[in-house]
């Protein structure tokens, strides 16, 4: 309720100003999630589980992060949260680095994504762990089937199209191949791993990494989602706030009349 009033006020303040159109979409997405009870509850759960850094061996790290619990909470967020809202958080389009940094931090990467060491392992390591995992393996196969370009082509994408690719990508978050944005100046994504130290299996390693980084099907799906995002979020928040705008308008008008 208080939040709705705040949003409505903010809306009044911003209407007609140029900043309204080029605002931070990741902030918009976070606000839309906050306004939805289920999204907000699931997000609070993973934030509480994912604070702090991961430590080796599944012990709680500094700040109490147990990676397996954090990842389970993230999987629940995507499995049970409203996709329009969870996907808006995950795929919000950014122009500046402040927005991109926020997007990179969305899923508490110190616990869910990187570490516990300082140097990322070879990508063959998470790949092999995923292939041995009953949870991860089908999700990775679905990601390959729905997001990888056709063999021998760089940009012929699976026919089911972008929305399915985004859904299965989101399904990888919280597995041993959890991907994230790599920096705050691009939209490149990958699991936390590299291919420098992969010896004679370099090609296999690069092939896995290319599923994520500069994959034209995944990048295209993210861009297509982003071009629809403002209308998606408006639909989500409309039920919450827009009716209040009218009486706030009336109140503002009355207050102005009193002043004049
Ligand atoms: C972007 O990332 C760099 C390197 O990690 C960091 O130094 C910088 O503070 C980040 N920018 C923002 C706006 O957070």
Curated annotation (Swiss-Prot):
Lipid attachment points (GPI-anchor amidated threonine): 237
Record key words, sorted: Cell membrane, Glycoprotein, GPI-anchor, Lipoprotein, Membrane, Receptor, Secreted, Signal
GO molecular function: coreceptor activity; glial cell-derived neurotrophic factor receptor activity
Pfam families xrefs: GDNF (PF02351)
Domain of life of the native organism: Eukaryota
One cellular component (GO) term of this entry: side of membrane
Pro-peptide positions on chain: 238-260
Function: Receptor for persephin (PSPN), a growth factor that exhibits neurotrophic activity on mesencephalic dopaminergic and motor neurons. Acts by binding to its coreceptor, GFRA4, leading to autophosphorylation and activation of the RET receptor. May be important in C-cell development and, in the postnatal development of the adrenal medulla.
Protein name per UniProt: GDNF family receptor alpha-4
Species whose genome carries this gene: Mus musculus (Mouse)
């Amino acid at each position: 309720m208080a939040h709705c009033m705040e949003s409505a006020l903010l809306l009044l303040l911003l209407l007609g100003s140029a900043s309204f159109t080029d605002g931070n979409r990741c902030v918009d997405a976070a606000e839309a999630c906050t306004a939805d009870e289920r999204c907000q509850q699931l997000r609070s759960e993973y934030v509480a589980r994912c604070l702090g850094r991961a430590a080796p061996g599944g012990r709680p790290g500094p700040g109490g992060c147990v990676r397996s619990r954090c990842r389970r909470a993230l999987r629940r967020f995507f499995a049970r949260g409203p996709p329009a809202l969870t996907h808006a958080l995950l795929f919000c389009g950014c122009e500046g680095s402040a927005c991109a940094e926020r997007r990179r931090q969305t899923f508490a990467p110190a616990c869910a994504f990187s570490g516990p060491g300082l140097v990322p392992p070879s990508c063959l390591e998470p790949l092999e762990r995923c292939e041995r995992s009953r949870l991860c393996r089908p999700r990775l196969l679905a990601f390959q089937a729905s997001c990888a370009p056709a063999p021998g082509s760089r940009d012929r994408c699976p026919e089911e199209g972008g929305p399915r690719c985004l859904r299965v990508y989101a399904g990888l978050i919280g597995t041993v191949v959890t991907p994230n944005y790599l920096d705050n100046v691009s939209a490149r994504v990958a699991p936390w791993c590299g291919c420098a130290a992969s010896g004679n299996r370099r090609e296999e390693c690069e092939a896995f990494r290319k599923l994520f980084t500069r994959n034209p099907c995944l990048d295209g799906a993210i861009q297509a989602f982003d071009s629809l995002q403002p209308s998606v979020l408006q639909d989500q928040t409309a039920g919450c706030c827009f009716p209040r705008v009218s009486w706030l308008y009336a109140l503002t008008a009355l207050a102005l009349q009193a002043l004049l």
